[in-house]
Amino acid sequence: MNGEWKSALRLQIEALAKRNELHRKSSVDEIKKRTVDMDKRIVKLRELVGSSANDAALFYLECVCHADETERLLNRGSSVGKEKKWKKVKRKTSSSVAPPLSRTISSLPGVSSPDVIQTIDVSALEDQTPQRPHWWDQFQLYRRTDLLRFSKQNDRRELWRTQKDFFLSCLGFMVGVGHTMRFPAKVYQHGGGVFFIPYLFSLIFFGLPLVFLHLSLGQYTGQAANTAFQRLMPIGSGVGWALVVIAIPVAVYYNIIVAWAIHYFFQSAKGLLLGDELPWETCRDEWQLDNRCCNLHNLHSCFNSTNSITAPEAFFHSEVLSLSTFGDFALGPLQSHLVLSLAAAWLLVFFGVFKGLGSIAQTMNVTATVPYLLLSILLLRGISLPGANKGLTFLFTVDSTKLWKWQIWKSAAEQVFYELGIDAGPLISMAAFSRYRNNIYRDSVLLVIMDALTSCLSGMVIFSFVGFIASESNSNVNDVLKHDPLYLSFTVYPGVTSFMYWGGLWATLFFGMLVLAAIDAEFAWLEMIASAFMNHFSMKNKAVENRLLAFLCLAGFFLGLPLCAQGGIFVFHAIENLNANWNSFSLALLSVAIVCYVYGIDNYLTDISAMLRVPRIQISKATRLKEKLIYFFGPGGIYIKFSLCFICPVILTVLLVASVLGYQRISFAGRPIPIDYEIVAWIVMIGPLLVVPLVAFMQIRQIRNEGKLLKSLFDTSEWRESQDDSLEPKDLYMRQSGKFESPPNRRRTPTIFTHRENTYMYIDSRGPTVRSRVFPLGASLDPYGWKAGRLRDRQQQIEETASNYSEEDSATTNSFMASTVKHNDDMELTLFGSPPAILGDDEKIMTTRFSESMPVNYKCRNVEVPRIPNKLPQNMERMARKTRKKRSSPSASDPPVPTSPLPPPPKLQHCRSEPPMMNSKESHSPEIITPGDDSPSISNSSDDSSDDCFRRATVIRRKTSDDDAFTHFSTATAESISITPLDFPRQRSLSSVAIYDQEQKNGRSKVLSQLKRPKPIDMPPK
């Protein structure tokens, strides 16, 4: 006990020394003098620990007060006279100590004497209520001294608060400009409802599989795209980095759409509040364009002439984009209104992401749901307009003659890539913050369904307004737009509001919806870029991440300024036409090839099925319908497997070849744009593909410098753990030929539970978590022990193997072991670990074996649980006496006594509240520990009464395999549970505190450490 006390004190001293090293970094002379003085104190303190522990503890308190005073001086100097954010905590310098220190020392053995407790005086805190922080404190822009203090607190990875936040964030990322602006433009361009056929085909056969691939990669690894592919295999890290790099130009040019929507929102709100007419209702003389401008209320005469456009189209090109003519391709000066709108857009993005997942989730709850409400309101208003049926008929009419053009299939594939966001890695990054056991396949299916429904809803809203304009202008739907339909949301809908009552209100709602739908995708792009760099440099400090996000927003604003120029629309148009094209098809094809063909689709689906706890089913005639559906359409089923292996590669290859062979120059308003803008678009969108060979070359160079073989480029050791580590790769073994050769390569097989989920209280929920589960209180402690064990041996295995062992071996297969420690007159039943190693003269160890013929008092999960009689000491003595008698008087002439079959242990289904199994092929059965001849005698004294308070018991479990249930008796594992007297009235559950290590040689599993509790108490301390 004294050794443990000293060890804990030495740990406190080392922590104090590290704290002094942090203080030493200050440049203040007074602080330097205090650190030198602290060094001398620490040297003296280390000497006192060996000689006098009590004196060392008291002197340690003085050192802590000295360090606290030094830290107060540091904080006072860094604040530069400013008022503190939190109220100061005043302590007595003579005998003050921090609460964690007092709890640590008081809980150590040997410090429970009254004289020691009196010397450690903890003064009461005068005021612990913090002041309300200022609004600028939310930005967490700390000084360097504050970063040193907060770095350890923030070194923890965030998770989504709920799975609803994760789903809404993914939905908000998908639902945006691709639905409200791009999808109606594609339908309008390809002649209506015929576009739905290739669109739905693309969603089903490579949209959903690729969404599931991205989400499962992120959730399985818990990392961004670059680190996820790095863990899969080093040669694939280039694909992950390409998915990150390609997001940078997309995030820059994507935000200019938000800037346009903000400008329209401001103009609409201005007209609504001031009561003025909307600026796009009538034509103006300063709008000098090549086409004739027509007022909305004079559409009949306007559309009878050629080269005429509506007032909303003229407003967008002349007022918003500041184009003089469609043939003027000069870049021109910056437009002040677009610069201000772009700055507002990046400010909104920063306020949405600066608090991490918490702020993103809160923002996404609004931006992902409010657009659906606004779209529903706009749809009801749109279908009530005269002529709306004309536009809806155009939307749902299928012209089969256009179905055989390859352009429509290419456009549908591009639209699917653009909508779902599978052309980059935001889905991987968002899934990395999800729980490990989350049903990611269900989320993938729901996201794709919601994506298709949103596209249909947006199309109905836009085309109801297009039909209304066509009816008012007495023209066909095909003739409403004279220019590129890509900007249909900014040219069609503003004109509709002029014919409505409260047109300013409806315009404000529409463009507010457009801002919300577009900006949440920007959150995902920025968070993915920041997460990739934070993971690459192994940083988790929130202050550093916030500064990185602020830098990305500032850099995005300056990089987006060329798009705010007079000719910036041409650069935007070139990038928009090349996005989700060659780059998306190439990266998707490389991702599928690495996962399905290099790593192996069967291996990957086995890993994901183990993560989701979905078995790989083999169907037969007796298979139920539910299992057949899982076999064909489950996460590891035929649909996903063949879609990723055959359909996706074929379609992506055909689309890539068709895009290369059918490439045409980019044009705007019927005129080809200058080659300079097109080259910029090529560099921005196709350039990230060069990252793949560049990173692969760097990986090869690193492998050669480390002296490894090239096959290590395809090493998957970081992806999943190996079940069989008994044979080391560097070991040599003798074959039949007698030559020493290298052992054959063994394919790593996945385990049902990963190594890290056996860690105690793993915060990421990757595996069974320790969670409360209330059990009925019985008359004994045995149900607790049986419930804590993972007893999964079947009756047939026990009956077949029990008869092959001797009576002595069979006595060690199915039992429950408990140990009691007697401290003078108090009896204690130890529920954890082996009996105490150091016992005094007055302490006795009693170990007993409960027989297999115990009565049963109740059932737990429909499994009978044996019950320990109330009088435990008497039964222990009687059973131990019988065992000694059998062992002491054996007779060689006696016939062998047949061993009766042992009762099966209870089968417990795996649940998150129970301790995890060691691996997928291991199960546990209890072991009987019978006291041998050298065991201490068990006396049936009066002290061993049934009224004694049993506080602990020990469960010893034996690890066996399915193939040989009782052969490896040498590999025993122990798992600990804790029950204190206060746990019984509260009905506390059992919690696993054993930490296992799966990466041990020869397949042995050992207990690395056991968390020990202090001595149980009967009532809370005063």
From Swiss-Prot:
Entry's localization field: Membrane; Cytoplasm; Vesicle
Comp. bias regions, Pro residues: 893-907
Extracellular side of membrane: 186-192, 263-337, 381-412, 466-498, 572-584, 663-677
A GO cellular component entry from the record: plasma membrane
Chain positions covered by the region annotation Disordered: 867-948, 995-1022
Chief place of localization: membrane
The keyword Cell inner membrane appears for this protein: no
An individual GO BP term: sodium ion transmembrane transport
MF (Gene Ontology): amino acid:sodium symporter activity; L-amino acid transmembrane transporter activity; STAT family protein binding
CDD domains xref list: SLC6sbd (cd10324)
One Pfam family hit: SNF
Compositionally biased tracts (Low complexity): 933-943
Residue intervals passing through the bilayer: 166-185, 193-213, 242-262, 338-358, 360-380, 413-433, 445-465, 499-519, 551-571, 585-605, 642-662, 678-698
Membrane topology recorded in Swiss-Prot or TrEMBL: Multi-pass membrane protein
Assembly: May interact with STAT family transcription factor sta-2; the interaction is probably direct.
UniProt-listed PANTHER family: SODIUM-DEPENDENT TRANSPORTER SNF-12, SODIUM/CHLORIDE DEPENDENT TRANSPORTER
Family of the protein in this entry: Belongs to the sodium:neurotransmitter symporter (SNF) (TC 2.A.22) family.
Function text: Probably mediates sodium-dependent uptake of unknown small molecule(s). By positively modulating expression, in the epidermis, of antimicrobial peptides such as nlp-29, plays a role in resistance to fungal infection and in the response to physical wounding and phorbol ester PMA treatment. Role in response to wounding of the epidermis may be facilitated by recruitment of snf-12 to the wound site by microtubule-dependent vesicle trafficking.
Protein name: Sodium-dependent transporter snf-12
